[in-house]
């Protein structure tokens, strides 16, 4: 247990919902509506509140828009399951609803960064600048594992996914987050636990994402297809690299070879950070992002 007080946001997010292809999508918005827009896309098993710490560190005013992806946070779950390509279509709808007709800067972490990068390649007219936080494509799946992979996918659909573990208190959930990332401070963990959880009918707490997200996508990753999208990106791009060692570095050329696919990219490593670099060093991440957004 802990007697630490939860992190108190300096800038307050306002919640609203937009229709997203038949689902009710929850969106957090910070800052004046007439300020420069900035769209932030969260990663797997997370929600838009994950960006609160960097939003609080921005020196300038931005109209920050952070949707919860389908099946995450306060956005509706999809009983038919999830395909990665859904995120691209969902993002297109959210942009048309909230910032129609203009190219906007988009930043994404992990899965959200993967979606942002691919979207920037297939809809370049909608992205003015692109920021990827530890999101530089995946390592190719082993084709020989495809039969077992698809067998698992079928089994989960027939038997149901592993259900979320129940917790009695937010403090227990916060402690779980700290166990996963030892750099995360308890005050931030308590904030994230409160924003990323929901209460069950029996009064216990659970993480607010659809357990179906634990199922694998039905289509395995293909690096060549990802690379083709990267080569279509027109927007100036910033890759923010965490301090962890990535599997990508085991490839020939490592991260540099992947970065070379993008026409106009700058890579910046944020030392002494985990995959969640926006939690570990939010002031530095915000400073680097803001300098990039304001350049040119």
Where are these predicted regions, by residue range?
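Conserved loop-alpha-helix segment in the C-terminal half of the alpha/beta-hydrolase fold
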Residues: 232-273
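Conserved HGGG/HGGXW glycine-rich cap/lid loop of the alpha/beta-hydrolase fold
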Residues: 26-77
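A catalytic-pocket lid/entrance helix-loop region that shapes and gates access to the active site
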Residues: 133-166
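Catalytic histidine-centered segment of alpha/beta-hydrolase-like enzymes
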Residues: 273-282, 286
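Conserved alpha/beta-hydrolase catalytic His-Asp/Glu region
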Residues: 161-220, 229
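Conserved acidic catalytic loop of the alpha/beta-hydrolase fold
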Residues: 88-103
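Alpha/beta-hydrolase fold catalytic core
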Residues: 1-38, 59-62, 99-102, 137, ...
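Conserved hydrolase catalytic core segment
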Residues: 101-146
């Amino acid at each position: 247990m802990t007697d630490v007080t939860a992190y108190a946001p300096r800038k307050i997010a306002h919640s609203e919902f937009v229709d997203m292809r038949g689902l009710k999508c929850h969106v957090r918005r910070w800052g004046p509506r007439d300020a420069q827009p900035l769209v932030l896309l969260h990663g797997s098993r997370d929600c838009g509140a994950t960006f609160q710490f960097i939003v609080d560190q921005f020196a300038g005013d931005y109209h920050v828009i952070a949707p919860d992806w389908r099946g995450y946070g306060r956005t509706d779950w999809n009983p038919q399951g999830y395909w990665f390509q859904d995120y691209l279509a969902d993002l297109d709808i959210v942009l048309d609803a909230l910032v129609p007709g203009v190219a906007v800067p988009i930043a994404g972490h992990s899965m959200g960064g993967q979606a942002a990068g691919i979207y920037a390649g297939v809809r370049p007219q909608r992205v003015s600048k692109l920021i990827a936080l530890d999101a530089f494509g995946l390592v190719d799946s082993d084709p020989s594992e495809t039969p077992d992979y698809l067998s698992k996918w079928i089994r989960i659909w027939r038997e149901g996914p592993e259900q979320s573990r129940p917790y009695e208190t937010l403090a227990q959930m916060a402690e779980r987050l700290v166990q996963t990332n030892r750099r995360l401070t308890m005050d931030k963990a308590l904030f994230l636990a409160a924003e990323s959880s929901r209460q069950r009918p029996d009064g216990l707490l659970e993480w607010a994402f659809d357990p179906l997200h634990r199922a694998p996508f039905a289509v395995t990753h293909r690096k060549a297809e990802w690379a083709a999208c990267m080569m279509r990106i027109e927007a100036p791009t910033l890759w923010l690299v965490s301090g962890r060692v990535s599997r990508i570095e085991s490839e020939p050329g490592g991260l540099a070879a992947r970065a070379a696919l993008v026409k106009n990219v700058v890579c910046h490593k944020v030392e002494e950070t985990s995959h969640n670099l926006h939690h570990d060093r939010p002031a530095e991440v915000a400073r680097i992002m803001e300098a990039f957004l304001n350049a040119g």
